[in-house]
């Protein structure tokens, strides 16, 4: 069923979400990465990107924060572009682990594959697959170019975050070499880990992430730049991955309460994809116990529920002037 709203009405809903959530004091910044612990906890922004390229944004949507695990979506798309859907399914997989995002146990339980590129093990594996094999500099260029194409503008590496991540990524070092033990990493493990750490340290804005989400929702065509970033056949594949594991072991609850596939990161960002309709992103540093932004979750849930939209319903938003 079509749900018609004016652009002004949609802006009002986004503003309402911001106003309703802004004063929430729940959660706390990630404290196991020193840089993230020191980000201003009061920062908060919401951005929506429509498929015609129009954006609606409220709050701190131009602040660059650490993309963290939201970058897993971007590199999964790059791997899908370079290898195709079947090879990624065979070499990495698309299943949720039901365990925390940085789980080593998940590798031990399912050592024939890494489950999904949207948890740490699968993301490190995906970084190892990025072409050209064996060339760290060119791999990095491909990763950054892909993020730029999806977001419509370039990210910026946050050097302090990269150092902070590199100094504390002991668990991920174990993951990389355990993957090597099971032949589930496809380039040098240390190189793959460094690429993964760097991509998580890219600085992006909520506005940029909403455009990236809009690109997925638009079947691979960036709504703002109009560039075809990836083939339309891959959009349902990456959206399925996000829907299955975007909030890790809490994805079921998220889908039940929000109705939108979304990926979260410990930098405070959440990026949601409503296929054929829009992309949405929100950012606020304080996280819940599972590492998901408290305010960003509430804001996106408010917008979805207020508009009566759900990826599993036949409601379709039409924005009119």
Regions found by a protein language model. Name each.
Residues 137, 166-169, 177-237, 288-293:
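Penicillin-binding protein/beta-lactamase superfamily catalytic region
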Residues 62-64:
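A short acidic/small-residue loop/turn micro-motif
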Residues 52-53, 66-89, 212, 280:
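Active-site SXXK
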Residues 1-10, 19, 23, 30-40, ...:
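Non-catalytic interaction/Regulatory regions outside core domains
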Residues 219-321:
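Structured C-terminal helix/loop/strand segments within mature extracytoplasmic catalytic/sensor domains
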Residues 36-39, 114-116, 167, 259-263:
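Short Gly/Pro-enriched turn/cap motifs at secondary-structure boundaries
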């Amino acid at each position: 069923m079509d749900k018609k709203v004016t652009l002004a009405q949609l802006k009002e809903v986004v503003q309402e979400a911001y106003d309703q959530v802004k004063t929430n004091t729940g959660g706390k910044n990630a404290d196991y990465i020193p840089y993230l612990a020191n980000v201003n906890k009061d920062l908060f922004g919401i951005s929506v990107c429509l498929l015609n390229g129009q954006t609606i944004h409220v709050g701190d949507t131009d602040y660059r924060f650490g993309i963290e695990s939201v970058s897993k979506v971007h590199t999964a798309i790059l791997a899908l572009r370079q290898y195709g859907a079947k090879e990624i399914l065979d070499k990495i997989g698309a299943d949720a682990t039901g365990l925390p995002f940085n789980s080593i146990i998940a590798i031990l339980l399912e050592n024939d594959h890494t489950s999904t590129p949207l948890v740490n093990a699968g993301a490190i594996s995906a970084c190892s697959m990025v072409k050209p094999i064996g060339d760290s500099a060119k791999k990095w260029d491909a990763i950054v170019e892909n993020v730029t194409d999806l977001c419509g503008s370039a990210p910026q590496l946050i050097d302090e975050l990269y150092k902070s991540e590199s100094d504390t990524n002991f668990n991920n070092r174990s993951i990389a070499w355990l993957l090597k033990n099971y032949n589930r990493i496809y380039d040098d493990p240390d190189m793959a880990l460094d690429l993964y750490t760097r991509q998580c340290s890219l600085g992006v804005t909520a506005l940029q992430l909403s455009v990236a989400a809009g690109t997925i929702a638009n079947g691979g065509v960036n709504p703002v730049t109009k560039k075809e970033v990836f083939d339309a056949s891959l959009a349902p594949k990456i959206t399925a991955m996000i829907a299955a594991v975007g909030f890790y072991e809490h994805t079921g609850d998220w889908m039940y309460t929000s109705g939108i596939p979304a990926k979260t990161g410990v930098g405070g960002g959440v990026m949601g994809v409503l296929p054929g309709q829009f992309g949405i992103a929100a950012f606020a540093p304080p996280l819940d116990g599972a590492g998901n932004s408290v305010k960003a979750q509430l804001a996106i849930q408010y917008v979805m529920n207020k508009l009566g939209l759900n990826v599993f319903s036949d409601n379709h938003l039409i924005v009119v002037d």
